[in-house]
Amino acid sequence: MERWSGVLRVPLHPNSRTFHRVGASLCLSPETRTLLVPKANAIFFCGDRVEGTGNPVIERLSNLQNLSEIIVSKFGSFTNAWVIEASAFNGPFAVYKDFIPSVNQYGEPSSYHPNGFPASTSTVSLLSNCLEEVRSVLPTPLHYMAKKVILGTQVDTKSGLSPSCSFSRSKTFILGFSKGGAVLNQIVTELGFSDIGSNANSPDVGQLMGRKFAGSEEIYVVPKTKEDLLNSISEIHYVDVGLNSAGAYLTNHDVFERISKRLMQGASELRFILHGTPRQWSDKRRDWIRNEKDKMLRLLESEAPKSGGKFKVLERFYFTDKPPSMQMHFEIIESLDAS
C-alpha cells in the first residue's frame, strides 16, 4: 500500500490563532497516488510533553511521525493514522480546551458533559482541515487526474466508481495516551448521549467498493459530521492513561448504560480495551488512577452482557515484572496489543 506521511500544523477553525500538530499516515492509490477511503481511521490523542530526558526511546516514541507509523503497524496497512497533539501547552502540560471545555490551566478536567458535543465536533473539524492541507501538498497532476474529489476520495468521472481498494463506511478506532485519555472520556460521554443514526446497520466496511455514488451513498476519507464519527467508532483504547487529578478514567455509570442501550437498539458493536503499565496502575502516590480504572472496568463488565455480544471489554497489563518508569510509559505504545 502506497502512503502519504507527514506532520501537519492545522487550525481547528479557519480564524483560529492556535494550531494542532498532527502526525498523519494515509492510504494512497498505487496507480494515481491519490487519497483512498481507508478500512479504518485510527485517531490517537497524545498526552503531556516529556522533554529533556536524554532518553532516545522516549524521544523516538514522542515523535508524531514515528507514532503514526506505529499505529498503522498495529491496525493494518488499510488504516489511516492520525496522531493529534493539543493546540495549547502550559509548560509541558497539554491543554485540550477545544475538546474538553472544563479543563483548568493544566489541562485537568473538572467534569465531562455532552453539551455541545465539543470533542466529536472538534475531531471532525480537525480531520477535515488536515485533509485539506494534505490535498494542497499532493502533486497537482496526480491529485486531480480527471477525478472528482469528495474529501479526498477519488471517483472516476466516467464510471462513477471509486478505486477497487477503497472501503465503504470506514470504522473509527480512538486511542488516548496518558492525558489523551481525558479526550476519550469526553468522546465516550458524547457517544452515550448521541443518536444511533442511519448508518448503525450499514454494510461491513471491509466490503470492497464497486458501486456508483448517488446522493446519500457518497463516502468520505474521514467522518463528515459528529454523528458520522460517533456512529463509526468500533474500538476505544485507553493507553496507560493518567492525570495528576481525578478524572483519568470515566466512572459515570449512566454513560455506560446509555452506550449499552444504543447497542441493543442496533448500533454497531463496540470494544473497550484498557492498556496499562506499573507506571500508572501501580503508582501509590496517585492511587486514584488504579481505583478509577477498576471502577470503570466493573461498570463496563456489568453492561457488556446486556448487549448480546456487541459490547466487549478487555484489560491488558504490560511490563508487570518491571519497576515503574517513564520509559515503560512510552514503550507501551510500541508493545500495544490491539487484537
Identify what each model region corresponds to.
Residues N55-E59, A94-F99, Q186-E190, A248-D254, ...:
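Short coil/turn segments at secondary-structure boundaries
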Residues S68-W82, S232, R262-F272, L297-V313:
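Structural alpha-beta junctions
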Residues W4-S16, H20-S29, I273-S339:
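C-terminal catalytic histidine-bearing segment of alpha/beta-hydrolase fold enzymes
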Residues P92-L142:
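Intrinsically disordered, low-complexity, Ser/Thr/Glu/Asp/Lys/Arg-enriched terminal regions and linkers
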